[in-house]
Structures are given as structure tokens and as C-alpha cells.
Design a protein with these regions (language model features):
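Structural signature of hydrophobic alpha-helical transmembrane segments
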Residues: 1-14, 51-71, 126-141, 187-198
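C-terminal ends of transmembrane helices
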Residues: 16-29, 70-89, 144-159, 202-215, ...
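Cytoplasmic-side transmembrane-helix entry/capping segments in multi-pass membrane proteins
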Residues: 31-40, 62-63, 84-96, 159-171, ...
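Transmembrane alpha-helix boundary signature
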Residues: 48-63, 75-86, 101-118
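Transmembrane helix-loop junctions at the membrane interface of multipass transporters and ion channels
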Residues: 106-120, 184-190, 217, 224-244
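Mobile "lid/hinge" segments at catalytic clefts and subdomain interfaces of large enzymes
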Residues: 211, 226-269
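Membrane-interfacial segments at transmembrane helix termini in multi-pass membrane proteins
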Residues: 248-308
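Structured cytosolic domains appended to multi-pass membrane proteins
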Residues: 289-465
Length: 465
């Protein structure tokens, strides 16, 4: 296939990826967006195969591995529960980074196969491209592995910090720049392998100081890194589809990270440099004696809901862990049969990845027009009769507005405390991932429901009926 014809099809593929992003921006058009993305990827892969023009034995191996990898990916995605989606995303990000590293290694060791020159005589611009792609890919891989381990519970979700951490990260960052310079000058293998090794280490050190509550931002940031790694390798391979795709993923991930940082009153550059969410708890709530709380049960909750005219549901990570989304949908359907207005309030960083709660509610077939973002619904809490908080801790904590010493101070929260009655479903009074005691627990209008989120919701349904 001619280069001009390939470029046209790659452009079509890029347009389909843009349409996919547009479709995925709304639940109503998400299926259509997913279809555009699949179609664009099929076109890109097919044209890449046809452009090679050499159907040798090695090419057949590539096809076999492609089908094997695609089948495994489809099987994993099909089998994985929705509650484990954050770690699945982190795992896939790691594979994107590792793929970029492998392509860079292949191009460096065998440049003739990529029309980049000969060993020791690689084009200068190609060296820069593969160096950046390999470095960002290595950081993405190791960072995503740490994120996966934290999300999976294999590694502690608490921030891991040590003295001089930021200085070490700075030193490693400078070392990477110096190594890229010397690699382009000397084309030495030792500099190339050192670059990859230090990049792996830096990716690890950037993520370990980040707390579990801040994982949604980490996931979107790693998504951005994987995109830029792919774009860098796209330049090396002179593959316009890979460049377009990488740029789309990289820019969209960076924009999403910035938006989420604003939603948490955090610094965007802290995310990039690491140490995000590692602030130790100095809140005045820490160390205080435990205050008395009002404790209720499913019967109390059902009574309050039956006598309400409007109810707002605030889902959080606790709902995901308990897999309570289907029971929650059933409870809401019961309330609506009694002419009670029900809506869902979603905080932008609720859960462990961007859109985590939206995905779970969509799985339970919750109507899209009942789901509202923070800015859309925050003013409605003051007029609501009952708020049902199901596992959403830090994003409902009033200390974000009242306690300047709190690690979450300044973070926009859902104004749950303004509601007439707050039903808070939680296993215990333990703080959330931010490590801050929630003032909402001790408010006069709060009734604590200590139980598994799914079991409590099911008990409420029984009492409603």
C-alpha cells in the first residue's frame, strides 16, 4: 500500500478516535463512542499490516501474538468485576508503557528494520524521539504497577515518604536529561540502558508517596503519560495513527488531571512531581476523643425515607467495595413508586478512578438524567429531606471548609450537612483515605448506619415494602 493511501486511512482512524472521545464524554453516547474507537483501532492495525508489505514468517508471529493478546485482553475485561475497574485501568496503562519501552529497545538495537540508520549511526532526531518515548514509557510502567498494587490492596494505600525524596526525584530527572544528551552524542548502549533503568526508578518514586484517596488523579495522570509515550514512539516509527492517538490520550489525560486537581484544590504540578496526597494529617480532629454519634438501623432509615418528598443519594467507594449499586437502584425504584423524588450526587473524585461511580451506576441501569455532578446538585442539599450517603467519606467532610489545618482543607465537597436528615452508611467511624475524622458523623442531623452497604440497603428495601 502506498504511503499516501496509508496516510489517508490513518487520518480517518484519527478522526474516529476523536469521535470516540466525544461519544465517551456522555453516558447517552458512550456505546457509539466505544464503537468509533474500536473501528478506528481496527483500521489503524489493518493499515499498519498492509503497509509492511512483507508477509514473512516473522509477520505471522506478530499476527499470532496480536490475536493472543487481544483475546486475553477481552477475556480479562469481560471477567473483571466493575469494582476492580481502577486496577484494571492501571494494569493496562502499565502495558502501554512497557510496549513503548520494548519498541524503543528494538529500534535502538536494530535500527535498519525501522529505516533509522545503522547501529552507532542512528538519526539524531530519531534518537531523541525513542529516548523520550522509552523514558516516559518506563516511568508509566513502573508507576502504573505501583498504582495497581495500591489499588489491589497488595501494597499499602498510605503515602510512603522518606527524607529528601523530592531532591532524589529532582536528581533522577536531571540524570535522565543528561543521559538523553549523552546518548544522542555517543549512541552508547550503556547510556541507553541506564536511561531506561533510572526512568523505571523515577516512575516508582513518583507514585509511592501518593495516598489511595488521590488515586483518581494518579490514574488520569498515568493515562496521560502512556499517551505521550505512545506518541514519542509514533514519531520513531513514523506512524501518524500512533502519533495522533498518543497525543489525544496524552492531552485528554492531562486536561482531566487538571480538572480533577481543581476539584480537590490540589496543585497540578504536585501530581507531576510526586508527593501528591502525602501531607500528614495535622487536622485538629486528629487525636480528639471520640464524640457521641446517633446510631440508627434500617427501620429508622426506611421511616425517614417514606416520609420524605426528596432524597439525594451520595455514592462513594464503600458502594463499590460492597457492590451495592444494584440494591441501591432497587431501593430508589421503590422510593419513586411512592412519588418520592430521587437523584444521585457524584463528586468528581469519588471512588478510585475518574468516573468510577458513574460506571457502577450505569452498570445498574440508573437513568442518566438522575445523576448529577457536584456543581449541578450542591445547592439542592439544603432543600432535600434525606441524604443517603453510601460509603462516601472524604468528599462529604465539612472540615474541608472549616478546618484550615485539615489535609483536605479547600477541597470542594458535597454540602451534605445542609440537608434535614443525613443517613450515613459505614462499617465504622474510621476515617477515609485522607486520614481525617469526618465531622459529619457527629452532626445532630446525621444518623449513622453501621453495616455493609449492600446489606443495609437490602434491609431498607424490606422495610420500605
Amino acid at each position: 500500500m502506498s504511503a499516501n493511501l496509508s496516510a489517508i486511512f490513518y487520518l480517518i482512524s484519527g478522526i474516529l478516535f476523536i469521535l470516540a472521545l466525544r461519544g465517551l464524554s456522555s453516558p447517552e453516547t458512550s456505546r457509539q463512542g466505544n464503537f468509533f474507537g474500536i473501528l478506528g483501532m481496527v483500521i489503524a492495525i489493518t493499515i499498519t499490516f498492509l503497509s509492511v508489505g512483507n508477509f514473512s514468517t516473522g509477520f505471522i508471529y506478530v499476527l499470532i501474538f496480536l490475536l493472543t493478546g487481544g483475546s486475553l485482553g477481552a477475556l480479562i475485561a469481560y471477567k473483571i468485576p466493575m469494582t476492580a475497574m481502577p486496577e484494571l485501568v492501571a494494569g493496562f496503562h502499565s502495558l502501554v508503557g512497557l510496549a513503548a519501552v520494548f519498541v524503543a529497545i528494538s529500534a535502538f538495537l536494530n535500527p535498519e528494520a525501522f529505516n533509522l540508520g545503522s547501529p552507532g549511526n542512528i538519526k539524531f532526531l530519531s534518537l531523541i524521539e525513542m529516548s523520550i518515548g522509552a523514558s516516559v514509557g518506563a516511568m508509566t510502567f513502573s508507576g502504573s504497577i505501583i498504582a495497581f498494587l495500591k489499588l489491589r490492596g497488595i501494597m499499602s494505600g498510605s503515602p510512603i515518604t522518606f527524607k529528601g525524596q523530592h531532591y532524589i526525584n529532582l536528581l533522577l530527572g536531571i540524570s535522565i536529561i543528561v543521559l538523553i544528551f549523552y546518548l544522542c552524542s555517543t549512541q552508547s548502549e550503556s547510556f541507553f540502558w541506564s536511561l531506561i533503568g533510572i526512568s523505571f526508578l523515577l516512575g516508582l518514586l513518583l507514585i509511592i508517596p501518593i495516598g489511595g484517596a488521590d488515586m483518581p488523579v494518579v490514574i488520569s495522570m498515568l493515562n496521560s503519560y502512556s499517551g505521550w509515550a505512545a506518541a514519542g514512539i509514533g514519531f520513531t516509527l513514523e506512524n501518524s495513527a500512533l502519533i495522533i492517538t498518543g497525543a489525544l490520550v496524552g492531552s485528554s489525560g492531562a486536561i482531566l488531571s487538571y480538572i480533577m486537581c481543581k476539584g480537590m484544590n490540589r496543585s497540578f504540578f504536585n501530581v507531576i512531581l510526586g508527593g501528591f496526597g502525602a501531607t500528614e494529617q495535622t487536622s485538629s480532629s486528629k487525636g480528639k476523643e471520640q464524640k457521641p454519634v446517633k446510631i440508627g438501623n434500617a427501620e429508622d432509615a426506611a421511616f425517614l425515607m417514606k416520609n420524605a418528598s426528596s432524597v439525594i443519594i451520595v455514592p462513594g467507594y464503600g458502594m463499590a467495595v460492597a457492590q451495592a449499586q444494584h440494591a441501591l437502584r432497587e431501593m430508589v425504584d421503590t422510593l419513586k413508586k411512592n412519588d418520592i423524588k430521587v437523584s444521585y450526587a457524584i463528586h468528581p473524585v469519588a471512588g478510585r478512578m475518574p468516573g468510577h461511580m458513574n460506571v457502577l451506576l450505569a452498570e445498574a441501569n440508573v437513568p442518566y438524567d438522575e445523576v448529577f455532578e457536584l456543581e449541578e446538585i450542591n445547592n439542592d442539599f439544603a432543600n432535600a429531606d434525606v441524604v443517603y450517603v453510601i460509603g462516601a467519606n472524604d468528599v462529604t467532610n465539612p472540615s474541608a471548609k472549616t478546618d484550615p489545618q485539615s489535609p483536605i482543607y479547600g477541597m470542594p465537597i458535597l454540602d451534605v450537612e445542609k440537608c434535614k436528615s443525613v443517613l450515613f452508611v459505614k462499617r465504622s467511624l474510621s476515617p477515609g483515605y485522607a486520614g481525617v475524622d469526618n465531622e459529619l458523623f457527629y452532626r445532630d442531623n446525621t444518623l449513622m448506619l453501621f453495616a455493609d452497604a449492600k446489606k443495609m440497603t437490602e434491609e431498607i428495601i424490606k422495610n420500605l415494602n
